[in-house]
A protein has these predicted regions:
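Conserved phosphate/anionic-ligand binding catalytic regions in large, soluble enzymes, centered on
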Residues: 9, 13, 17-21, 25, ...
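Short, glycine-/Ser/Thr-/acidic-enriched flexible segments
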Residues: 10, 19-21, 83-86, 96-98, ...
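Active-site phosphate/pyrophosphate-binding segments
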Residues: 174-178, 182-212, 304-435, 443, ...
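A residue-level signal for conserved active-site and pocket-lining positions in enzyme catalytic cores
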Residues: 18, 46, 78, 95, ...
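Generic, well-ordered alpha-helical scaffold segments in large soluble proteins
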Residues: 29, 49, 53, 71, ...
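Conserved short alpha-helical segments that host acidic/polar catalytic motifs at enzyme active sites
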Residues: 1-160, 164-167, 176-183, 187-207, ...
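Glycine-rich phosphate-binding loops that contact phosphosugars or nucleotide phosphates
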Residues: 206-356, 390, 437-482, 497, ...
Length: 522
């Protein structure tokens, strides 16, 4: 599926981002008209469909593009060039984002603002179905008057130096990224949480009866933990969490004001944007974004939000954006508690634990090679792996399993420790590798799980903040204790384990096969 695709006549070239759902029907129609295809992609169908209309009598390229796109079902962002007008480029979109920026030297069309490479002062967010012409002679020609959006200039590192991979650089960067998430915008003042980006919610907060967290992949795991944070404070009765890809109209509460919390590292995730489109005409729903990329699609379209401020992530597998998401959700839950209960001042120890998290992460990072050794990694180097935790740690287990899949190519599954006996137990055999997360909150129950697994002679690696467990030190990693956000310390260690295991398996962790950093298609 290399781009650009060229039409059969050779007159048109096209770049496409998205998925066309009815491309097989259109392809069959074109085959009957004598078109020959070089690939099985929906993109080649689009360029040949435009070509078909362009070759009809008295149809110009603008009309041909509109006639073709009117027949497309699905999402697309198209950039088209015609040999008869080589000084112009045509763009049109439906559902898939396109941004256009211009300066005195050139014009850039991109799917996200980072594509401008700090070369533009302003850009335009192209609307669905507006055919835009970019011309060397005439600049940008649109059918809609657009309001310019100011670009945010960001300093980008070009290499992961001094580290071998971006994945490791971003894991090690978490002491700084968490500090940025905590401090940018002055989010803690004495014993109060200040989240100016959520002022919109304040006037509705007494009427909100439903809160729904929505995300995909790593962000979904963060959402589950965010739900637990808020649920533990007993300020809202109905708190749910959904995978954005599975959310539909039937999941919208039947009554009452609803706050929809949407989490996305890129701010461009197609499945989340689909949810925004789904509920945009529902007056009882308030949308809130937790995103990392400033001025991204989701950030622009929600009612209010909080930026993660984790900094740019290059590696496909999310690391620092996950821990920043957890920190933001912790701040959000405490902020919501303050506003809802009018209990403005929080316990000083709560604030101190939150403030200490970046220092504790720094301590782990500085001592990681003594904390995790070759014996630990060899223990886990297998084709199958279980990771078990309870409460919030169940979702840390699931996030670890995702990392093991992404960068180690291991069939890893994360479960609640209590779920093991409901089926996964049947897969346990001698030497089967299991990571067990034993936190203080669930120590007794997880210790019972340990004994059950040990009796099956599985290979167990325990991660815990409890320093006095009677365990073989070669199968036991102790992390610092944080009574408010212990899960961030656990996942930091588990990210390091995933990275080291990827290297042992001779896999480049920065670029997992078949995966993309930003998922802009359903």
């Amino acid at each position: 599926n290399a781009h650009p695709h060229i039409s059969q006549s050779g007159k048109l070239s096209l770049i496409h981002n998205g998925i066309i759902e009815n491309y097989k029907i259109l392809k069959t129609e074109l085959l009957c008209k004598g078109f020959i295809f070089k690939s099985d992609t929906d993109s080649e169908v689009i360029v040949n469909l435009i070509d078909y209309y362009y070759n009809l009598p008295e149809i110009d390229i603008d009309e041909a593009i509109k006639m073709a796109t009117d027949r497309l079902e699905g999402t697309y962002g198209l950039v088209i060039q015609c040999i008869d007008n080589p000084l112009s480029v045509y763009i049109i979109r439906n559902g898939s984002p396109i941004l256009v920026g211009e300066n005195e030297n050139y014009i850039i069309a991109t799917s996200e603002a980072s594509g401008f490479l700090n070369q533009m002062n302003n850009y335009y967010v192209i609307e669905n179905n507006d055919l835009v012409v970019l011309s060397i002679n005439d600049g940008i020609k649109t059918n809609i008057i657009y309001k310019p959006v100011k670009t945010q200039n960001v300093s980008y590192a070009l290499t992961p130096d001094p580290y071998e991979h971006w994945t490791l650089k971003e894991i090690m960067d978490q002491s700084h990224s968490l500090l940025n998430s905590l401090n940018n915008g002055g989010r803690i003042f004495n014993t109060q949480i200040k989240l100016g980006g959520l002022d919109y919610i304040k006037s509705y907060i007494d009427n909100i009866v439903n809160i729904i967290f929505i995300g995909c992949g790593t962000s979904l795991n963060a959402c589950h933990i965010g739900r637990i944070y808020l649920k533990s404070l007993s300020v809202v009765n109905n708190i749910q969490c959904f995978d954005a890809a599975e959310f539909d109209m039937n999941d919208i509460p039947l009554s009452g004001k609803t706050l929809l919390v949407m989490c996305s590292q890129s701010g461009e995730t197609k499945d989340l944007h689909r949810v925004i489109q789904l509920i945009k005409d529902k007056p009882d729903i308030i949308t809130m974004g937790v995103v990392n990329v400033v001025d991204s699609l989701i950030a622009r379209e929600v009612d209010c939000g909080i930026y993660m401020n984790a900094g740019r992530e290059v590696a496909v597998a999310s690391t620092k954006s996950f821990t920043s998401s957890l920190l933001i959700f912790k701040l959000f839950s405490l902020w919501y508690f303050q506003i809802k209960t009018k209990n403005i001042n929080l316990n000083k120890s709560v604030i101190q634990n939150i403030r200490n998290i970046n220092i504790q992460i720094g301590t782990i990072n500085n001592n990681i090679d003594s904390l995790i050794n070759d014996t630990h990694i060899s223990l886990l180097n297998a084709e199958n792996l279980f990771i078990l935790g309870k409460g919030k740690m169940e979702h840390i287990a699931k996030e670890t399993a995702l990392k093991m899949k992404e960068i180690c190519y291991i069939h890893a599954e994360g479960y609640s420790g209590s779920a093991l006996k409901h089926g996964p137990f049947a897969l346990l055999t001698p030497d089967f590798p299991v990571i067990l997360i034993i936190d203080k909150e669930n120590e007794d129950k997880m210790w019972n799980v340990y004994k059950e697994i040990e009796s099956r002679k599985a290979n167990i690696l325990v991660i815990s903040e409890i320093s006095n467990l009677e365990l073989d030190p070669t199968k036991y990693i102790i992390v610092p204790e944080n009574k408010e956000i212990q899960e961030i310390l656990f996942i930091n260690v588990l990210q390091h384990i995933s990275y080291k295991l990827a290297l042992k398996r001779e896999i480049n962790p920065d670029k997992p096969r078949n995966l993309a950093k930003v998922v802009t298609v359903e």
